[in-house]
């Protein structure tokens, strides 16, 4: 009888653990927003912007993320890029899209000699067209691929 209960309870326990694991996992779309969206501010030449934001957005835990870009536009405008000019991603995938106009961004690059846990970044505000990879339903940005100068 005890064996019968174990046979029923073990798969149920595994199922519960799988569901709980999925609930706690950040979606790719949410990760994109955490790592790249800063709609509430404008690009800043403040030299500490990247140091503060990279730490605040959990990109300096366990290692220093070498490069990151923050976009200072409304989320809906960045989401709309998924329906603009289709381009090939750096990795060869075909789910990237380029914004039709320039956006305000801030590039953060790890400075030479900077090592974890003392991650130090160079802050570079720019106006560039952005390239993002999109997927899902709804179709939304899940990866920041690049920024390019506006050729117009």
UniProtKB/Swiss-Prot annotation:
Enzyme type, top EC level: lyase
Disulphides: 50-108, 64-119, 82-134, 89-96
Sugar attachment sites: 46, 112
Enzyme Commission number, as recorded: 4.6.1.18
Entry-linked SMART domains: RNAse_Pc (SM00092)
Signal peptide span: 1-24
Superkingdom per UniProt: Eukaryota
Record keywords: Disulfide bond, Endonuclease, Glycoprotein, Hydrolase, Lyase, Nuclease, Secreted, Signal
GO cellular component, one term: extracellular region
Catalytic residues as annotated in Swiss-Prot or TrEMBL: 36 (proton acceptor), 143 (proton donor)
GO molecular function, one term: ribonuclease A activity
Binding residues for substrate: 31, 34, 65-69, 90, 109
Major subcellular location class: secreted
PROSITE patterns: RNASE_PANCREATIC
Subunit architecture: Monomer. Interacts with and forms tight 1:1 complexes with RNH1. Dimerization of two such complexes may occur. Interaction with RNH1 inhibits this protein.
Function: Endonuclease that catalyzes the cleavage of RNA on the 3' side of pyrimidine nucleotides. Acts on single-stranded and double-stranded RNA.
Protein name, entry field: Ribonuclease pancreatic
Organism listed in the record: Papio hamadryas
């Amino acid at each position: 009888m005890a064996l019968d209960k174990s046979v029923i309870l073990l798969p149920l326990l595994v199922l519960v653990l799988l569901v709980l694991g999925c609930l706690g996992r950040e979606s790719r779309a949410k990760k994109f927003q955490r790592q790249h969206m800063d709609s509430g501010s404008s690009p800043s030449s403040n030299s500490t912007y990247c140091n503060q934001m990279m730490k605040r957005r959990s990109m300096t835990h366990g290692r220093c993320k070498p490069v990151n870009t923050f976009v200072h536009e409304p989320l809906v405008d960045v989401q709309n890029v998924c329906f603009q000019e289709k381009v090939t991603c750096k990795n060869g995938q075909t789910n990237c899209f380029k914004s039709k106009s320039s956006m305000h961004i801030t590039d953060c690059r790890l400075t030479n000699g900077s090592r974890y846990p003392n991650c130090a970044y160079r802050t570079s505000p720019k106006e560039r067209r952005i390239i993002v990879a999109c997927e899902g339903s709804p179709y939304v940005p899940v990866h920041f691929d690049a920024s390019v100068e506006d050729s117009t």
